[in-house]
A protein has these predicted regions:
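Ribonuclease/tRNase effector modules and their secretory precursors
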Residues: 1-93
Length: 93
């Protein structure tokens, strides 16, 4: 999945219950989330619990996170909405 041309649907950070406020509760910024969504080396999958698409990768600060998101529009432009993001252990191979 290539999201480099996707638009990201962020709420206002000061709005209670916003997606940007929610990721901040996990110690992440929108820039870190976007660095994974748009980054090289990102792995995509589907969440077992929610059925939503997920992206695993390293942030610009080097943290390994998962981003759970919804696809709002599959046409051009692709629009995605981050639901949550949090740090996870990096898989060992």
């Amino acid at each position: 999945m290539d999201l480099r041309d996707a638009l990201i649907d962020w709420d206002e950070p000061n709005d209670e219950g916003s997606n940007s406020a929610h990721i901040a509760e996990h110690g992440l910024t929108p820039e870190e989330v976007e660095s994974v969504l748009f980054g090289d080396g990102t792995t995509f999958d589907v969440s077992d619990s929610s059925g939503r698409p997920v992206a695993f990768g390293h942030t610009v600060t080097g943290r390994f996170i998962v981003v759970v998101f919804d696809v709002l529009n599959v046409a051009d432009p692709l629009i995605i909405r981050p639901i949550t993001a949090y740090e996870v252990p990096e898989p060992t191979e």
